[in-house]
Amino acid sequence: MLMIRLSRRGARKQPHYRIVVIEKDRARDGRSVEVVGTYNPRTNPGSIELKRERVEYWVSKGAQMSDRVKKLWDKTPAAPASVA
């Protein structure tokens, strides 16, 4: 099963995370299928960058979000509808 979860990067005591699509049974920092965003908790407030269309694509294919990623998803504003 695919999961959308955080993968830790950064130096000791200076965490920076990638939001990745990865098999559920892989290691936290293991090989991922796709990187769909980043999260830096050290800024005030924490900076979140998400490729919303890619996250929606993977969720439609059956990927599940971790609890933390769900909270980050709720914090990010939806992209405004393009005027065409």
Curated annotation (Swiss-Prot):
Molecular functions per Gene Ontology: structural constituent of ribosome
GO term, biological process aspect, one: translation
Keywords assigned by UniProt, alphabetized:
Ribonucleoprotein, Ribosomal protein
Q: InterPro entries recorded for this chain?
A: Ribosomal_bS16 (IPR000307), Ribosomal_bS16_CS (IPR020592), Ribosomal_bS16_dom_sf (IPR023803)
Which superkingdom? Bacteria
Q: Name one GO cellular component term.
A: small ribosomal subunit
The record's family statement is:
Belongs to the bacterial ribosomal protein bS16 family.
Protein name per the record: Small ribosomal subunit protein bS16
Native source species = Koribacter versatilis (strain Ellin345)
